[in-house]
Design a protein with these regions (language model features):
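Tubulin/FtsZ superfamily GTPase core signature
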Residues: 123, 128, 132-135, 139-277
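Acidic/proline-rich low-complexity IDRs
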Residues: 108, 115-118, 206, 241-242
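Generic anion/oxyanion-binding catalytic loop in active/binding sites
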Residues: 80, 119, 172
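Conserved catalytic or regulatory cores that recognize and/or transform ribose-phosphate-containing ligands
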Residues: 1-112, 116, 137-141
Length: 277
């Protein structure tokens, strides 16, 4: 704030010059100090593309973010280019509020940390700041894991923090059999649900059959409408040999499969279904 006025820095592709000017005018009339771009390289200011100028302007814009209380992203039709993506990550790291012209999928913890790595590689943030970013990332990741582990149901439970689902899966089951691009799909979700189904019997075959029966009778409609399903079969003995039988009832679904051993002396089996809508 400066003399009671909020300071807002505009970010986005300079191809949206008209939207920049309209937003600058509107936010100014709402009583804000607005910092915008100085040149529109994608809208006719060709000097931007001469040697050294674009790098200078990119560094300047990070300084403009430092001056602001908030950034406002001009993302017409949801478009966010690489430079803007890095500016969003930088603003988040610096604790700035972030608003968007249009509703869009917000970057994840992992997206922002990767973008900060690009800024560090380009020499635009210091070793010290990147080290701090890494520590912040670890703290937020651990908080997301704690959120995941603290959730007890009742199921299905709608997750407000999709990061919590991903972090929980990674933390509880490791990266084995999970492809990064599969996990990435979770962030495209409108909502993410988890259902946990406990087997009821004293032997593996009957345990898995009771789980399959529950899936078919209670969950197939929602599963059929999902974009992706993450299936984790947990058993007191190695459950990997039972995946084929389980997969028969999910034929045609986009599924990531994984197993986990339960450390218990009792005969037990549980299925986690995380499905993305």
């Amino acid at each position: 704030m400066i003399n009671g006025f909020k300071v807002i820095t505009l970010c986005g592709s300079t191809r949206f010059k008209d939207e920049f000017l309209e937003t600058q005018k509107r936010l100014t009339l709402e009583g804000n100090i607005v910092i915008s771009v100085g040149l529109y390289g994608h809208s006719g200011d060709d000097v931007v593309w001469t040697e050294g100028v674009k790098d200078m302007l990119d560094s300047q814009h990070l300084a403009k973010i430092d001056l602001a209380d908030e950034i406002f992203v001009i993302n017409v039709d949801g478009y966010i280019g690489d430079s803007t993506r890095r500016e969003i990550a930088y603003a988040e790291f610096k604790g700035k509020a972030i608003s968007y012209l249009e509703e869009c999928r917000k970057p994840s913890l992992y997206d922002n940390y990767a973008a900060l790595g690009e800024l560090h590689d380009a020499g635009r943030i210091s070793d010290e700041d990147f080290g701090k970013a890494g520590r912040n990332f670890d703290e937020k990741r651990k908080a997301a894991i704690a959120e995941y582990n603290a959730c007890q149901g009742p199921w299905p439970y709608q997750w407000k923090n999709i990061d919590a689902v991903v972090c929980g899966i990674l933390q509880q089951h490791g990266l084995v059999s999970i492809d990064y691009h599969d996990i990435k799909d979770l962030y495209e979700a409108n909502s993410v649900y988890e259902v946990r189904i406990k087997g009821k019997s004293t032997n593996d075959e009957e345990l898995i059959q009771s789980i399959i029966d529950t899936i078919r009778s209670e969950h197939m409609a929602q599963l059929r409408s999902s974009k992706k399903v993450v299936v984790t079969l947990c058993g007191s003995s190695d459950p990997s040999g039972l995946l084929e039988k389980l997969s028969d009832c999910m034929d045609g679904l986009n599924v990531v499969w994984q197993t986990r051993n339960l450390h218990t002396d009792e005969k037990d089996m549980e299925l986690s279904l995380v499905y993305v809508l």
